Amino acid sequence: MSERLKRMMGHKEVSVGAMLLGVMLISWLFNSTFLSFENLMDVIKSNAVLGTCAMGMLLIIITGGIDVSIGSQLALVTVLTGQIMNRTGFDNLILIYLLGIAIGGAVGLLNGLMVSRLGLPPIIATLGMASSIDGFLRYYTNGTWINQLPQRIIDFGLTKFFSLRNANGSEIGVPVQFLLFALAMLVTWFLIKRTMLGRSIMAMGSNPVSAQRIGLNNKRLTAFAYAFSGMMAGFAAITYTSIMKSVDPNAFIGYEMNVIGAVVLGGALLTGGSGSVLGTFLGMMLFAFISNGLTLARISTYWQSIIVGGIILLAVSFDMIKLRREERRQTKVDIDMTAQGKGVA
């Protein structure tokens, strides 16, 4: 194997992409409709919310944190904006999206302040937030759905670009949710790769002590990462409402595991300092295609959860084993260099 090929295979994105192609091939062998344009677009539409939230979660995981309240944030935004639309008939999509982003960003910022200013462990801070939001929603909605949303948001959810009619007379095209997800990816990529803020977050995640020594404000960077994730959740929540045409306050129970799983499958390390937009996208698609393939193969939803959960555990375990090996190798190199230095002296 050439040195260049070895370096390519060492990139997490390449290995995830190879697994994605393998899953697609196996699923196609079981069901020939898997690779049809209609199915691929349905998969993307159904997972646009997951992908958008994963882009926000990526920043948090890069900092070495985690947010298990993401599902509760989604539910909160859908319920509050859904109630406004239901009771007033308000249907200005731009303002609704901005409101959703503001609500999600506020909750995310509160999470970030609890972690950065109060020093609470991320899992404790966000778990407490999730519990508080869930309790409020149960009290506020009594578990009832919100229906009768403005027609404009329903029509928006059905919007397709480059539409054509297939042989059956059905309309096929690129769903608007794909473009919204692409926008979320572009914003996240630009933030990480083209701004000092994004590079500072990467540096802090890799080595918080060194980042602070060179003058980076770790507390502000952490708070921003959680706020950004909340804004992405708010953006995704409105997209979800446009897809479902109604609001179910219980729709996102356990959803945070899907979001975290997609980011981890894409190569981000839970220890921080590692992760990319491309890897997260591939991880989300791998997650989505595995679920879709199992559905088309008529596998029970219970077994689907077991299989997907097992894959996530294997991915995390593999990454941690690889990280431990690299740490041991680096420690050995440091010891050898120290011994050589003493020998020269």
Locations of regions flagged by a protein language model:
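Cytosolic-side transmembrane-helix boundaries in multi-pass membrane proteins
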Residues: 1-25, 206-209, 213, 217-220, ...
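Transmembrane helix-bundle core of multi-pass membrane transporters
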Residues: 7, 122-194, 223-224, 244-249, ...
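Loop-to-transmembrane alpha-helix initiation sites
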Residues: 13, 46, 122, 151, ...
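Hydrophobic core segments of alpha-helical transmembrane domains in multi-pass membrane transport
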Residues: 16-28, 57, 130-135, 177-191, ...
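Single transmembrane alpha-helix segments in multi-pass membrane proteins
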Residues: 23-88, 113-120, 263, 267-277, ...
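Alpha-helical transmembrane segments within multi-pass membrane transporters and channels
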Residues: 89-130, 282-283
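Helix-loop-helix "hairpin" substructures at the membrane interface of multi-pass membrane proteins
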Residues: 92-100, 107-111, 165-247
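Transmembrane alpha-helical segments in multi-pass inner-membrane proteins
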Residues: 226, 230-234, 243-308
